[in-house]
Design a protein with these regions (language model features):
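Alpha-helical scaffolding within the catalytic cores
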Residues: 5, 62-68, 116-134, 175-180, ...
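Extended acidic/polar, glycine-enriched regions
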Residues: 1-13, 102
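Aromatic- and acidic-residue-enriched carbohydrate-binding clefts of CAZyme catalytic domains
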Residues: 27-65, 92-107, 114, 118-143
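Short, well-ordered coil/turn segments that N-cap beta-strands
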Residues: 15-17, 75-79, 135-140, 169-172, ...
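Catalytic-core region of carbohydrate-active enzymes that cleave or remodel glycosidic bonds
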Residues: 163-176, 188-249
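Substrate-binding cleft/loops of secretory-pathway carbohydrate-active enzymes
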Residues: 90-97, 104, 133-136, 178-204
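Short, solvent-exposed turn/loop segments enriched in Gly/Ser/Thr/Pro and often Arg
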Residues: 20-31, 83-87, 177-179
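Conserved, mostly hydrophobic/aromatic
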Residues: 15, 19, 72, 112, ...
Length: 249
């Protein structure tokens, strides 16, 4: 499906437990039109319109939803889909979607889930069959939003979670923050960290004292982003943080 064999073999050697797609700020976009939509990355590659992303270049979305699910199947790993819940990137001047726009995004999520999990007699399952995969791929995780937070996120998160869980109760729901503190259900919280080398070294015990009765933790992104990032010193700082994660997994 268009991916370099040598890179996929290295990925396979890592034996990943799951793959997150697409993840990152491409999910949020920088405008209502650039917010991620499943339908834009479905169907034949040559029919996908692509999108300008917030890093300043155009994504063809040639690696789309089908290719991602096929890669997960080939690697024998679980799939995690990340959807937009009606918010653009909050770091870059957020735009909040209105009611009809939120519903359109929620409908888009259901189309994606049907593509991954529906029978070939369904609308999106039939497209999957025409793309060469008659049987459902399956999907284990759904992450609602990317790096979103605050009351606006919590409201949208709960709307998506409730609707999806009613139809697909088997899906494991991932939140961007600890929404349980606002009284909302979740299975896993996705924590992202970008900081100095020293912060990562000093926080090697970050997870030693987490409440084991709370939600699971998924560190979806972390990196040193301050100072000279191309040094052994930086690598050791990140490694110290990783040791803490491994110790608590």
């Amino acid at each position: 499906h268009g991916l370099r064999r040598d890179l996929c073999e290295k990925l396979e050697a890592l034996r990943p437990g799951f793959l997150r797609f697409p993840g990152g700020c491409i999910v949020e976009g920088f405008s209502k039109s650039t917010a991620q939509r499943f339908k834009r990355m479905a169907g034949p590659v040559w029919e996908r319109p692509g999108v300008l992303n917030l890093w300043g270049y155009r994504s063809t979305e040639g690696l789309g939803f089908h290719e991602y699910l096929q890669l997960c199947e080939d690697l024998k790993t679980d799939a995690m889909y990340v959807c937009n819940c009606g918010m653009t990137c909050q770091v870059r001047g957020p735009i909040l979607m209105e009611e009809d726009e939120i519903q359109e995004l929620l409908d888009d999520v259901f189309c994606a889930l049907e593509y991954a999990m529906g029978g070939r007699e369904t609308v999106w399952g039939s497209l999957r069959a025409r793309m060469g995969h008659p049987e459902p791929f399956g999907l284990k995780y759904l992450e609602i939003g990317n790096e979103n937070n605050g009351p606006d996120y919590e409201e949208r998160y709960e709307r998506f979670r409730k609707a999806v869980s009613e139809k697909y109760p088997e899906l494991i729901i991932v939140a961007n923050t600890h929404v349980e503190e606002a009284g909302l259900p979740l299975h896993i919280a996705d924590e992202h960290f970008y900081n100095k080398t020293e912060w990562f070294a000093m926080n090697t015990h970050q997870y030693d004292h987490y409440d084991r009765r709370g939600p699971g933790i998924f560190v979806g992104e972390f990196a040193v982003v301050a100072g000279d990032i191309r040094t052994l010193y930086t690598a050791v700082g990140e490694a110290m943080f990783m040791v803490g994660m491994e110790r608590n997994q």
